Amino acid sequence: MASSTGDRSQAVRHGLRAKVLTLDGMNPRVRRVEYAVRGPIVQRALELEQELRQGVKKPFTEVIRANIGDAQAMGQRPITFLRQVLALCVNPDLLSSPNFPDDAKKRAERILQACGGHSLGAYSVSSGIQLIREDVARYIERRDGGIPADPNNVFLSTGASDAIVTVLKLLVAGEGHTRTGVLIPIPQYPLYSATLAELGAVQVDYYLDEERAWALDVAELHRALGQARDHCRPRALCVINPGNPTGQVQTRECIEAVIRFAFEERLFLLADEVYQDNVYAAGSQFHSFKKVLMEMGPPYAGQQELASFHSTSKGYMGECGFRGGYVEVVNMDAAVQQQMLKLMSVRLCPPVPGQALLDLVVSPPAPTDPSFAQFQAEKQAVLAELAAKAKLTEQVFNEAPGISCNPVQGAMYSFPRVQLPPRAVERAQELGLAPDMFFCLRLLEETGICVVPGSGFGQREGTYHFRMTILPPLEKLRLLLEKLSRFHAKFTLEYS
């Protein structure tokens, strides 16, 4: 016995002891999680940036990160009023400075009065600062033409993502054939597939129609639901509008049809509406699911369960790092709503600076305020430039042989389809890569352009895409698009 103990001690001294936590012994659901937006291509982009800093010669001088919707990382300037008020909230000593307009000072004082200890450094209640929840409710009422919004149904969150995960946690239950199924659009934002994998739910894919500008077809919802009921219990339907990664904006008629479908099939609706300010195409208009639902009247308005999400990260603000967001729940069971608050309480509260920023987004300067003119000019300039970039992206890609791109009606991305030669597909398979992953890796290595392969979002079999943000400055975007088109032509020739 003593000898055995001595052997173990010697093994420990020599570093031979096995790890308690190993890949084989860790949570298998975590191993199944994939998040393409920050996946292997992005890791390689980071390595290339490091190599460039070290003086390693490359066929390019910089890595262009067109993989993620992070506006300020791509050079967009913050909106002055938002940052002025935040600066005053973070450092109240500045309230006596003549360098800040009076309306910014009043807004900062109002927010600080609602904070514990009159400081952004204090925790808030778990559902968010009450004053800000009330301002969010008033914003929703204005947006939806006066339809009432109850601040008690508004929960602030760490970006929209945190709220989406929380609602999905409430929905997931059962084992085997009774496991919860969630219908998600394909292509989809990988937060959904990653969260469902982590929670052990069943991902139920419904395909958007690329031939009709990524339209949502209720017949396709019926197909997906019918097939899913053989192996799980579908309980929820997610819609992303405007679309990520596909950039489409749903019509009111489509939203009404989706609501009727969800009601008839007893599905909880999740409306991811974080790009509601990002609508560019003539004839396109954002319609909130809440507004359409309420205007449909009974039985839908009083019974269909809905959670709708918004964020400070997108829109004209692009304030990703502050992690501000909210969810409004409609027709949710009161007892379940208390359970949602309990879940949020475990994480204490959303970041208070993010809550403050959200307040400024939902209640911007009024026309009579000193900051209004500058605020409005900056906001419109951002949205006008995004609209120009959306049009340019569509135009350049559709002029390139072997690339086709649907109109970027909204959001911040294009999702072009690329033709890949059979020999390129075979080479990718030899390397154990998805064909579009192979294409995107080669693109990165030869041009420094970082985009995300369509396989990370889901796509119909035999088709290949990539997602690219439209956020780089206009002239840089023009060069990027031309460079990408030339690379595709060269790649096609190489493997023909």
Curated annotation (Swiss-Prot):
N6-(pyridoxal phosphate)lysine: residues bearing it: K314
Gene3D superfamilies (alphabetical): 1.10.287.1970, Aspartate Aminotransferase, domain 1 (3.90.1150.10), Type I PLP-dependent aspartate aminotransferase-like (Major domain) (3.40.640.10)
Gene Ontology annotations for the cellular component aspect, listed alphabetically: cytosol; extracellular exosome
Pathway stated in the Swiss-Prot or TrEMBL entry: Amino-acid degradation; L-alanine degradation via transaminase pathway; pyruvate from L-alanine: step 1/1
Subcellular localization, as worded in the UniProt entry: Cytoplasm
An example molecular function term from Gene Ontology annotations: pyridoxal phosphate binding
Modified residues (N-acetylalanine): A2
Alphabetical UniProt keywords: Acetylation, Aminotransferase, Cytoplasm, Phosphoprotein, Pyridoxal phosphate, Transferase
Residue numbers of Phosphothreonine PTMs: T22
Cleaved signal peptide residues: none
Family: Belongs to the class-I pyridoxal-phosphate-dependent aminotransferase family. Alanine aminotransferase subfamily.
The name this protein goes by in its record: Alanine aminotransferase 1
Taxonomic lineage of the native organism: Eukaryota, Metazoa, Chordata, Craniata, Vertebrata
